[in-house]
Amino acid sequence: MEFSSHHIRLLQQLDEQRRRDLFCDCHIIVEGQMFKAHRNVLFASSGYFKMLLSQSCRDMGEPITATFDVFSADTFTAILDFVYSGKLPLSGQNVIEVMSAASYLQMTDVIGVCKMFIKSSLDINEKDRDGFFSLSDKDTDSNGSGLYAAGWRTESSPTHTHKTTEHGSFIAGYNYPPPISSRLQHPFSKSPRKPELVRKHRRRLLPEALTPALSHIPLGDLVGGSTECMLHDEETVESVSQEEERTQTQVSIISIKVEDLDATSNSWPESPPQESLDQGSALHITKAEELYKAMPTILGGVSGWGEDELSSGRFKCPFCTHTVKRKADLKRHLRCHTGERPYPCEACGKRFTRLEHLRNHFQTIHEAGKLICRRCKLPVTKVTGRVIQDGTRRYRLCQACLAEAGLDNVNFDYGEDQPLVLPPENEREHCWNFKEEGRQENGSEAAESDLVIQEVVDSEEDELKQKQD
């Protein structure tokens, strides 16, 4: 026979012992505040304490002291109350801190409860909201006060979190508009738009050219009635009911027109004409998924046109929250986590994650360090070239250019740090001119000597011929 209340009484007794400081053999210090607990309870409820206490199980006679600086004292108080009572006091202010501390202490149950609390607090579905908006006037007059009291609150009510019994979702910190009964007290208030009409207006917009029957309907009537309604005390309920009936009739007309136009949407052009886009008094565009039906898919996923949520054409990194549109970008991003560097440099062996990084490295490091002759622009090395200092400038010349300058007979035994110093500019110009003039004179003398020799040879041959004759 099992007693379901036994573990509850056991936890209550252990909690009473903790509060009275009885048999507490574990002290936890958080922000200078000491918390006393039993090591058996902490061992059974936390993976971190299980690992910590199993290493010090030999010292059973003395109490164990542990210090934490990763969370606050209030956060640890909430976790310790959960360990001894099974009740976790969560709120919108401490849920993130409690989940972070539970993750550090390896308490999976607390993490799951925090995730459920966050999801239920922030996830207010449109279906639940439509449940309030779709109430008829009859239901509102009969039992509308009880429903609105549970789910709706005015702007003056304090911010709190509670759970509705009918819809099963938390409503936290949201100022919804008051019900119809409270709007009737303000005759000059604006009537809100119906969410179903807003949704149809956002997802199914009709072109003006294909809906001549709807062109005479004002835009304000399509999205929820007139802009301002003057409500009197006697005709209030009747005007509201008539307005809702007229709105529902117009919604049915719109849905019928949309269904008729879906069959002919394949023959429409890829983009609507510019004239229909410029007119703002009517609805111009059809459903986006039909209008852009002929567009190609991107990497197996079609991006959602006109959707508020994240499109299915994106790729999410499994290690972080980064999302990309292309699979190649995701593959390149994963190298940040895996450490893969598939592009090595052939000159120095350094590896890179991206090809453009390798190109930039090669251009700035290796190609920028090439030795080039200043005069002929040919590549040189430390053996075939020499550093020349011209005043404050230093550059390198090859052996051919040094020979042209008349510096080929200079001794190059001293080091690279000591450059060859050129003579002053006037002497250097005279040297260059002298070499050029000497080269020209030598060429002219050689030409004249060749001519003289040729003439001598010709005269000797003529004399020999004359003698033979």
Curated annotation (Swiss-Prot):
It comes from the Eukaryota. InterPro entries: BTB/POZ_dom, SKP1/BTB/POZ_sf, Znf_C2H2_sf, Znf_C2H2_type, ZnFinger_BTB_dom_contain. A zinc finger (C2H2-type) spans 315-337, 343-366. GO terms for molecular function: DNA-binding transcription factor activity, RNA polymerase II-specific; RNA polymerase II cis-regulatory region sequence-specific DNA binding; zinc ion binding. It is found in: Nucleus. Keywords: DNA-binding, Metal-binding, Nucleus, Phosphoprotein, Repeat, Transcription, Transcription regulation, Zinc, Zinc-finger. Its main location: nucleus. One of its GO terms (cellular component) is nucleus. Residues 24-92 form the BTB domain. It holds the Pfam family zf-C2H2. May be involved in transcriptional regulation. This is Zinc finger and BTB domain-containing protein 8A.1-B. The gene is zbtb8a.1-b.
